[in-house]
Amino acid sequence: MDKIPMTRAGFTALDDELKTLKTVERPAVIRSIAEAREHGDLSENAEYHAAREKQSFIEGRIKELEAILSLAEVIDPAKLSGSIKFGATVTILDEETEEERTYQIVGEAEADIEAGLLNIKSPLARALIGKDEGDSIEVKTPGGERGYEVVSVRFV
């Protein structure tokens, strides 16, 4: 399988989530299941079924995180330079609204647009890859085509 590019911060966040699921969440849900079993008939025991559903979610997320972390390739953006690539922190200017936004281009597993972490596979990130300060790009969005200018590129 292909390696999954990831920043150190993204790797640490996912690893911390995995540890919490294994050491806190999993034992708590096991206790909840045991307590619900004590209430008798399992066929109509809502607490039991809710706890089992939560256990299923936790186990699924643990498997997902283990798979992601086993394929992670941690990339240190501070060691990079040049045009926009994975790990770059990019400030862009929306040519229509004159609004500046800053994003760091990261892997899928750590992307969070609200936190300024832009998925490398997103249309905006794909349009930015390979560009330099001062370049302009056009991006197709659900609301139509948008133009942006690259204001700055940093590797931190």
UniProtKB/Swiss-Prot annotation:
Keyword field: Coiled coil, DNA-binding, Transcription, Transcription regulation
Keyword Transcription in annotation: yes
Coiled coil: 46-67
Taxonomy, superkingdom: Bacteria
GO molecular function: DNA binding; RNA polymerase binding
Pfam families the record matches: GreA_GreB, GreA_GreB_N
GO BP field: DNA-templated transcription elongation; regulation of DNA-templated transcription elongation
PANTHER family in alphabetical order: TRANSCRIPTION ELONGATION FACTOR GREA
Stated family: Belongs to the GreA/GreB family.
Xref: HAMAP family: GreA_GreB
Function: Necessary for efficient RNA polymerase transcription elongation past template-encoded arresting sites. The arresting sites in DNA have the property of trapping a certain fraction of elongating RNA polymerases that pass through, resulting in locked ternary complexes. Cleavage of the nascent transcript by cleavage factors such as GreA or GreB allows the resumption of elongation from the new 3'terminus. GreA releases sequences of 2 to 3 nucleotides.
Protein name: Transcription elongation factor GreA
